[in-house]
Amino acid sequence: MLKLNNIEFYNTPSGGVMVSVEGQEAFILLPTHYDLISILHDYIMQNYHGAYLALSSLYKGSAQNPSYYRYRIVSRFARCNFGEYETNVVDISKHTFHFEQVHCPLRGTGDCQLEKVVCNPQYTLPLTKQQINIFRMYADRLNTEQIAQRLSLSTNTIDRHRSDIQSKLNLHSITEMILFWTNNNLK
């Protein structure tokens, strides 16, 4: 089974998307790469819901052909977020997306309706508002006691929320929580 780990993407001059998976020869992403497209499509849909909705609306004309429809969504997402060839940090490692500032002639002009929706999208957290608030405080380097004091809750309640956050996001420490917050540009 394909895993979202050690994958690098980059745009070709002709507009294609090259994919380099560790241990494999690089290839151009095509609609026939069902396994990779399927796992990326599902991950985008679950974790970058705003970007997914925008792209699914943009490509709704292709929805009658599901594999091509998913390919178009994944290809555009990759072109807008992983298009630069980067040798220092892979684009996807351990189910974490490392977005790049892809050069785009439309960036900052107001001409692209998908700017800041698809490119560098906001991560969709499967957390309650209270959990997000507590997560944000940990990311701001507050400790459990400080968070409990600010929210007028017991440290046991804060620990329970932290445990729930870590469980939902498959994180194992406060350090991993902070890295996750930072890597996903959460606010």
Language model features with spans:
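Generic alpha-helical propensity signal that fires on short helical segments
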Residues: 35-37, 45-46, 120-122, 145, ...
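Alpha-helical interaction segments
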Residues: 93-95, 151, 170-171
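DNA-contacting interfaces and partner/effector-binding or oligomerization modules
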Residues: 1-115
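Residues within the DNA-recognition helix of helix-turn-helix
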Residues: 161-164
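Basic, Lys/Arg-enriched C-terminal extension of HTH/homeodomain DNA-binding domains
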Residues: 166-187
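Helix-turn-helix DNA-binding segment
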Residues: 117-157, 183
